[in-house]
Amino acid sequence: MALDLFKRVETRKGLFAVEKITLIYNLLTSILILFLFQRMDHPWHMLLDRAMIAAMTFLLMYLYRLAPCKFSAFVRIVIQMSLLSYWYPDTFEFNRFFPNLDHVFATAEEFIFNGQPAIWFCHTFPHLIVSEAFNMGYFFYYPMMLIVALFYFIYKFEWFEKMSFVLVTSFFI
C-alpha cells in the first residue's frame, strides 16, 4: 500500500478548518486572559504562547503552499491536534475563576430524571471490569485520537481534514 506522502495534492490555499477553529479559540481565550489579567498567575506567558501558536499556524500554512502534499497536510493537522494537550490544562486556569456549578447540574438531573443517572449506573454495574474500562478510556484519550487520525490519513485521506476538525471542535465545545 503506497501512501504517496510527497505526491502533490490539489487543495485550496489558506487555513484548514481545524486551524480556523483553533485560531478562534486562541483569540477568545486571549480576550478572556486580558479580562482576567490581574487575577491570573502567568498571563504574559499564556499570551506569548498564544501568539506563538498563531505564528506557527500561519508559518505552516505558508510552508504548505510551497509543498502541498499529504505529508505537509498531515503535519499541519497533527500539530493542531497535539495542541489539545496544551489547551486541556490551560482550561484549569480559567475554571479557577468561575464558580462550581456541579450543584446546578445535579439539580437539573434530579428534575429531569428524578434521580442521578451516574449513581444508578454505578449501582447497576459495580464490577471492577466496568470501572477499568472507563479508566482505560481516560488513559487512551489522546492515543485514541492519534489512532483515529492515522486511520483516516492512511485509508480515507479525503475525510482526514473533516475528521480532525470534528475532534478538535468537540474538544473546544
Regions found by a protein language model. Give the residues of each.
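Terminal transmembrane helix and immediately flanking juxtamembrane interfaces
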Residues: 1-173
